[in-house]
């Protein structure tokens, strides 16, 4: 019986791992990221961009997949007031990359997702000759496991973002009450 349970657990882990994808990989199915998401963690090599009142402290509510673009619906908090912000990200020539104009020119990819629970995004912003990067961890639910959060932190470090520049927003005002 124990062997059967271990076998089932092993097969479950293999199936879960096999379902992970990257927007730059051949197995990525953009349709599966359609729907509701929650911002869990933001990270940046310019921390001030994601701190309170930072221009990139955006709380994702929804991704709507179109043929060659994504409609992204966010909320921002300014002076404790929630505001809605929508933008359209267009596919670029590079596989799995999207671009959007917001406080500069941005390109982003989705290095990891399992579609059902989490999505990890990597964004590069260019404005006035300066560049910074931002990474986001998003969940289908308002919070994620510590294991997924740790995997995200390691991915941030691989991109040169220090742990002190990773902000867990799962307990912050993310305008959850403003969701329809």
Curated annotation (Swiss-Prot):
Q: Tissue-wise, where is it found? A: Abundant in the urine of adult male mice but absent from that of females.
Q: Specify the superkingdom.
A: Eukaryota
The record's annotation in InterPro entries points to:
Calycin, Lipocalin, Lipocalin_CS, Lipocln_cytosolic_FA-bd_dom, Maj_urinary
What is the first-listed, main subcellular location in coarse terms? secreted
Q: Which GO terms describe its biological process?
A: aerobic respiration; cellular response to lipid; energy reserve metabolic process; glucose homeostasis; heat generation; locomotor rhythm; mitochondrion organization; negative regulation of DNA-templated transcription
Which CDD domains does the protein's record reference?
Answer: lipocalin_MUP-like
| GO MF terms held by the record | insulin receptor activity; pheromone binding; small molecule binding
Annotated Gene Ontology cellular component terms = cytosol; extracellular space; nucleus
Matching PROSITE patterns: LIPOCALIN (PS00213)
Listed as disulfide-bonded, the cysteine pairs are 82-175
Span of the secretion signal?
A: 1-18
Q: Which key words are in the record? A: Disulfide bond, Pheromone-binding, Secreted, Signal, Transport
Q: Where in or outside the cell is it found? A: Secreted
* General function of this protein: Binds pheromones that are released from drying urine of males. These pheromones affect the sexual behavior of females.
Family assignment from sequence similarity? Belongs to the calycin superfamily. Lipocalin family.
Q: What is this protein called?
A: Major urinary protein 2
From which organism does this entry originate? Mus musculus (Mouse)
Q: Give the encoding gene's name.
A: Mup2
